[in-house]
């Protein structure tokens, strides 16, 4: 876990650096948040729950920090987060979610809606750099542990999608280490029950499968 802890600390330091070096960035994101009627706490968001990791079993990637996430500095803590936690608990995949599941995002930049990231046009370079950083962080964690990487929310994870750079970085890392592909899985987002709906299609067709077997069969063809 020492390597994982080093990666988490580096992530925390990187977020502090981004926020301190880009005051204009905070102001623009704050103005966007204001249109939705809430004050901004953090434009670039670290996940404090990563500091609780003790026995890493899964790396779970969502899209970007939303309103509650930026306020609490924790990833996946809204409705989708509750669905994710319930799934891991009910499927006996994790006894203690915060200690066993590292939750990351495809970018650390906050917007209320993921598609609002398109409105931050003047910070396109930072958005691209954030995707590279987060993709490398996920793969670095994967290489430093004996776990699986689950990437949820794939509608914008295409060559021309919002998270094209994240996908490109993943492909580059997998080209360097092809064995990684066996440990990376892609699923719909937990929001609106899409993750469970996708999995249930497989489980209905193959009732003989265990949850873990069904999860492997349900992965989307992205890489």
Task: List each model region and its residues.
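Active-site and ligand/interface coordination hotspots across diverse enzymes
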Residues: 1-77, 206, 210-223
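Conserved beta-strand scaffold positions in the cores of enzyme catalytic domains, especially
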Residues: 60, 101-103, 183-186
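Short, surface-exposed acidic-centric catalytic microdomains
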Residues: 81-119
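Short, well-ordered alpha-helix to beta-strand connector turns
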Residues: 55-56, 98, 145-147
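A structural preference for long, well-packed, hydrophobic secondary-structure segments
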Residues: 35-37, 68, 72, 91-95, ...
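Glycine/proline-rich loop-helix segments at beta-alpha junctions forming the active-site rim
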Residues: 2-6, 10, 111-223
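Glycine-rich anion-binding loop/nest that anchors nucleotide
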Residues: 60-64, 105, 148-156
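Short acidic (Asp/Glu) patches
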Residues: 40-46, 77-90, 129-135
